[in-house]
Amino acid sequence: MASLRKTHPLLKIANHALVDLPAPSNISVWWNFGSLLGLCLISQILTGLFLAMHYTSDIATAFSSVAHICRDVNYGWLIRNLHANGASFFFICIYLHIGRGLYYGSYLYKETWNIGVVLLLLVMATAFVGYVLPWGQMSFWGATVITNLLSAVPYVGGTLVQWIWGGFSVDNATLTRFFAFHFLLPFIVAAMTMLHLLFLHETGSNNPLGLNSDTDKISFHPYFSYKDLLGFAAVIILLTCLALFTPNLLGDPDNFTPANPLVTPPHIKPEWYFLFAYAILRSIPNKLGGVLALLASILVLMVVPILHTSKQRSLTFRPVTQFLFWALIANVAILTWIGGMPVEDPYIIIGQIASLTYFALFLLIMPMAALVENKVLGWQ
């Protein structure tokens, strides 16, 4: 008789996804980040739920309620530090996961990849509205600057901004709705994650060689379930160390000052994980152009599968494109640095060059390099 996990309607789904799933035998540690993102999402939802029990979404008490959580609630300081730094780990895992996808050609599973890009946009939206909730200086001014970008939309821009704000400035209505969005979006992310996995399991995982691995598969459990647990342990230890030893390392000191609409901070900047996109936004002198470039910096990922010109899937045996891939990583690091710098020379020109290089690498240089590699190998 077949075991219950293979026959029960609900357990059968879990079994096919987590136990008897055929997985390539050679997938490396770079394939761990999907499960780590699942861990981050669960961790963020749980810590966020406990924070929401004590938080008040009113401009008169929001800042004080966060202070109250840290001072008076049992382990509130720990829950808050885990939640704030958990967001950083979430984005570290996302960027490594995307980097893995770009390097090994996983983007050729188009449905999985496109849902992944939508997931990235949703997580970015969640993080943005979440950053506004403590109602510190950077929360308030970050919300003002970023929502104001919508005014660049032709014809309806002004109306759109007032609609988002719920008034004529970032005020109580804005904070209340941002709290509602911040509570709702993670559950939408969880639902989209299910779709992401559904489409992934239609094709099976890619592998470091970029070759068909149907002839060499092993079951997910116990091999990769234990491998994932090792990754979980590593991330939990790192997150706990960050939350306990240097909880404010990645935060902005300005956010320890309550929001004041009359005083603008000297340098308005988002959290570190948005700096690369913020640098691209700032490098274009035109408002609408900047907004479009900001959107394009993420949506460019959607055209990567269309621009795949190589006869090989992964970069494992493509040294020229490998070099360009690492140039792209360095470029994003430069953009991240520039995003945190004031708008003055030489930072302006460096940001503009890095922004141009970012798009050129995706849209022009890497597809052309792949064609050259095909020609050298006599594969065209």
Swiss-Prot record:
One of its GO terms (biological process) is mitochondrial electron transport, ubiquinol to cytochrome c. Keywords: Electron transport, Heme, Iron, Membrane, Metal-binding, Mitochondrion, Mitochondrion inner membrane, Respiratory chain, Transmembrane, Transmembrane helix, Transport, Ubiquinone. The keyword Phosphoprotein does not apply. One of its GO terms (molecular function) is metal ion binding. GO terms for cellular component: mitochondrial inner membrane; respiratory chain complex III. The keyword Phosphoprotein does not apply. It is found in: Mitochondrion inner membrane. SUPFAM superfamilies: a domain/subunit of cytochrome bc1 complex (Ubiquinol-cytochrome c reductase) (SSF81648), Transmembrane di-heme cytochromes (SSF81342). A ubiquinone binds at H201. Binds 2 heme b groups non-covalently. Heme b b562 binds at H83, H182. Heme 1 (or BL or b562) is low-potential and absorbs at about 562 nm, and heme 2 (or BH or b566) is high-potential and absorbs at about 566 nm. The cytochrome bc1 complex contains 3 respiratory subunits (MT-CYB, CYC1 and UQCRFS1), 2 core proteins (UQCRC1 and UQCRC2) and probably 6 low-molecular weight proteins. Component of the ubiquinol-cytochrome c reductase complex (complex III or cytochrome b-c1 complex) that is part of the mitochondrial respiratory chain. The b-c1 complex mediates electron transfer from ubiquinol to cytochrome c. Contributes to the generation of a proton gradient across the mitochondrial membrane that is then used for ATP synthesis. Belongs to the cytochrome b family. This is Cytochrome b. It comes from Pagrus major. The lineage of its organism: Eukaryota, Metazoa, Chordata, Craniata, Vertebrata. The gene is mt-cyb.
